[in-house]
Amino acid sequence: MADEVNENIFLVNAPAGSGKTTWIRQQVESYLLRNPKDNILCITYTNRAAEELGRDLEQSRVYFGTIHSFINDFIGSFFSHKEIIDLYWEVYETQIIERIKNTEQKETWTEGAERYKEKYGSLDLDTVRSNINKISYNETPFNSLLYGGLGHNDLITFTKLAVDRFPIIKKKISDKYQ
């Protein structure tokens, strides 16, 4: 059911009803007792699993959540830094220009452009650039690039780029959860 991938890093993969929650909870409780100054990061596949694992546990030293919620809650605080926004533009500027031009005349892009113009007065690269002051998680499969919003897959991809480019993010995670 559980394989130790690295020291103190486990991959738990088993079918429903096999005792995953019980096993993880026991491991967390045991670790917290043995290591009273440490914190635990426990990434789950679903929000429901995170809620179930966290039930009846003192959670000030344990983070239960999906990878998306962890990025949003912990790493998301970095997503308003100028360097991160610059990276966003480096990665997504071409796609943003495509959305603005909408040469393929995609109906959803046309509707989105109209909403953007209503909100900000115009839709051009300078306006979009001046309005994105934080990168955020949309909690959907789709990006909202004109607003700095990333969907499920791009949130993970972009976060990896940010962590690789800015080692301080990795250090903050290590300091808290290693």
Regions found by a protein language model. Name each.
Residues M1-E83:
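P-loop NTPase Walker
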Residues M1-N13, W23, E104-Q178:
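Accessory N-terminal region flanking or inserted into the helicase ATPase core
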Residues D56, F70-F74, R99, T103, ...:
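Residues that form generic nucleotide/phosphate-binding pockets
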